[in-house]
Amino acid sequence: NYERPENYDQMYNLILMTNKIASQPLNIDIDPIKHLLGSVKGQNFQRTLQRVRHVCDYNPWGTVTGRLAANPNSFPILTMSKEFRRCVRPNNDWLVELDFNAAELRTLLALAGQEQPKNDIHDWNVKNIFNSSMTRDEAKVKTFSWLYSSKENKDLERLYNKDFVRNKYWDGFKIKTDYGRIMDNVDEHHALNYIVQSTTIDMVHEQAYKVFKLLEGMKSNVAFLIHDAVYIDLANDERQAIVKMLDTFKKTPYGDFKVTVSAGKH
């Protein structure tokens, strides 16, 4: 008999959502990026546009940690340069981005047993870890250079507690996350990265699915996902739903995560 994996329900929901996304043609308009198409990079992107289908067709099994990959001939939403994203327009009226503030860092903080800061996490680090001795950008660089390296920083370790998190989810060979995702043959060098990235992306997908369900029966829909961010194709007469979407998205199993909301025509 086949035993259902612990994360079966979540993967089922993710496939439902990504299949629906793949059925929605993108509205591609090259006018906003015409000035970029003269470069070699721009010409290559234009050739890609002619070759691929204008849909976001994800592969949920494409990476060991659960990050989405793209199926062949999918629109390259995950890998295209940010400057070219302006060619993607909403089919309704607005593209709304819901983006977690420093999602992986917040996940690590939660796994270490700490409460979520309500404000920007890098500002919070400046005050609570670095005693206001550096700028936000300096704190961000210092934190991320420490996060996935062997560098020591007692102040960061005190709150983020990498060793505790690694030892809780990794047995020296295998990782099992809170979401029931299992990764085998993981060495110490990759263990923390896999734990944090995998837990974060499964949490993001779970929150995105809640927004997806919230929009059922509406004109607005989940247009696509880019790593830790969800993009909504929003109808103007449903714009009041943004408040509920934001409230739904930010309430994670690890506490309320700060979310940045932005909206535009592309």
Feature locations, PLM:
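Conserved catalytic core of nucleotide polymerization and phosphodiester-bond processing enzymes
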Residues: N1-H266
